[in-house]
Amino acid sequence: MQTFHKDNLFSLKQSRGLRVSFSARSAFTLVEILVVISILAILTVITITSINFALSSDLTRGASRQVQSYLAGARDRAIYAKEPRGVRFILDPANPTAVTSMIYIAPSPNWEQGIIRLERTDADSNSVADSASVFYVRGDGTDWASLASRDLIKQGSRIKIPGDDSGTWYVIDVDGSGVSGGTELLRLTVPYRDPGTSDPTEVIAFTPGSGPSTYLLELPPVILSGEEPTLLPNNTGIDLDRSFLPASWRPPIDSTHVSRGGDSQPGKAGVDDDSSGGADDNGELLWPGTDDYRLYSSQLDLMFSPRGSVLGSEAGSGKIHFVLDTLENIQSSWLRTTDYAEGDRVQLPARLAYAFTPYDRVYVCKTGGTSAGNPAVFLITGTRNEGDIVADGSVRWETQLNATPSLLTLFTRTGSVNAYPMYFDFAGNVPPDVFKYAETGEAAK
């Protein structure tokens, strides 16, 4: 048995004192708990934001890889089959400015029914030609009206005259043509190569027994047998308004090719958007900050030749830049005189000088309120630095880099498809050179 000693008594007192001291600090104070909760809340918000951003970026990169693979597949099919093959981009039913699925296509047989004759312009129908140039092709038994009613004669369609090996292909001016009812008249975008054999004042360009009577009319491609549409990853799409598209894909700004949106008026209903002295005129169609939107064709087709290059008018620009983004971002264009809440996110409207190109900044609402009427506040060089605050009516926006979209570039002369990051230009450069990496071949540092 251990001998009791006064030192033992001292040690016992010390240990009891320590236990008392420890037991007195066994819980947090209310202030400490509130501080911890606040820190955890801040960390949670930061973490969730980072996760959402990472997930969005992963989604668009996955969509970019899928489109890249699909285009490469169409090119390979054309080379292997030694016949043109292509891809049809299918619009999203709920968002007509986004593509959310694709399908493989092949060319249709050329249409050659009936016979034709060539005519000069006679705008006032007085049987005297307005000029010696031969612009019109009149059909007899061609059934072009039936084709037009099925949307098979489209802007950019071509006709070969005559229809044999000596013929030349011409682009059809669909808007200037008359193909309805009993009228079967196509207008060429350029005059026919031969001025005709009749007097230049005659409407019919060739005398009987001379001139071409055969033709080949190019029809839109058809879906390959057995193919089903391939969907892009959920919540992603090709942003047509912000992609650098072929001219033949870009709808003209008129009442036929622009939807007036929910208010059924050009621009913002009841507002003189363009300061022209009147509200709701056609000059305000597709005005920045309004709910108007472009009406794209239901047949956005890219065809590859057996050599691997892109065929048709779509090849004219040399390159096509596809912008893949989340559907939320695609639909988040800034609107004038609209209420916004904290956390809302907007993009610069893809209108006027900023049509068919992405913008390298986005804006997150930090103070809710009502927006003003001019998107130019987002273009001031002093508000393009990351973290800058943009004053827009009673709304305050924070500038952030637009890092969610992915870029995919198709080089039409070679058929190669490459993915590139979007270039975040310097704050002082407006408009920004967002396609710098894609067009110079540089990689992001």
Map each language-model feature to its residues.
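N-terminal secretory signal peptides that target proteins for export/translocation
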Residues: 1-23
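Residue-level "contact hotspot" at macromolecular interaction interfaces
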Residues: 23, 149-152, 339
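Conserved polar catalytic motif of the HATPase_c/GHKL fold
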Residues: 73
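A cross-taxa feature marking solvent-exposed loop/turn segments within ectodomains of secreted
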Residues: 41, 80-82, 358
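N-terminal helix-rich module
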Residues: 2-10, 28, 46-49, 53-68, ...
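N-terminal single-pass transmembrane signal-anchor helix
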Residues: 23-52, 70
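Tryptophan-rich substrate-binding surfaces of secreted polymer-degrading and adhesive proteins
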Residues: 332-400
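Exposed loop/turn and edge beta-strand positions of beta-sandwich/beta-sheet ligand-binding modules
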Residues: 33, 298, 359
